[in-house]
Design a protein with these regions (language model features):
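Glycan-recognition and catalytic cores of secretory/periplasmic carbohydrate-active enzymes
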Residues: 1-156
């Protein structure tokens, strides 16, 4: 079973580390390879957005949330694609960023009370109206916003 969100998060950690290590080409390539592979596997071709789990053999997922999309993989993908674009200049990452950003900001935000819903059905409908629980706290969303701001600021 694949969890695209965790792999995408790991990809941007590795890309960041490549920057800290004088733009280490091996780490950069590793981060980009993981990111490319997980974007291809994780993107829902039918409804858009990033699937929470994928089976490597394309078998049905047995988890009860198999038809859901969670907020945090989208947060991580927004950071990862923006960082990949910054360090490569490759337009494919700008396109991925735009696609993920548009999908996430179309479906996750609560336009009336703020914050993001954490759990959507595959088609983008709200599954659980909670915006905070044991698993969803104020971490991934503000981290994404802060990192995106810093990355964009570094591009100017």
């Amino acid at each position: 079973m694949l969890c695209p969100g965790h792999a995408i998060e790991a990809a941007w950690f590795i890309l960041n580390e490549s920057i800290f290590r004088n733009h280490d080409p091996r780490l950069k390539q590793l981060g980009l390879t993981i990111l490319d592979w997980m974007l291809d596997w994780g993107w829902d071709q039918e409804y858009g957005g990033i699937l929470y789990y994928r089976d490597v053999k394309n078998l049905p997922i047995q988890e009860y949330w198999q038809d859901m999309k969670f907020w945090w993989p989208h947060n991580e993908a927004i950071i990862a694609t923006l960082l990949a674009y910054q360090i490569t200049g490759d337009e494919k990452y700008a396109k991925w960023h735009q696609m993920i950003h548009q999908w996430a900001y179309q479906y996750f935000p609560d336009r009336e009370y703020g914050e993001w819903y954490g759990y959507l059905h595959r088609d983008g409908r709200i599954s659980v109206p909670l915006k905070g629980n044991f698993w969803k706290g104020p971490f991934h969303l503000p981290r994404m916003q802060l990192n995106a701001w810093k990355i964009i600021e570094g591009m100017e």
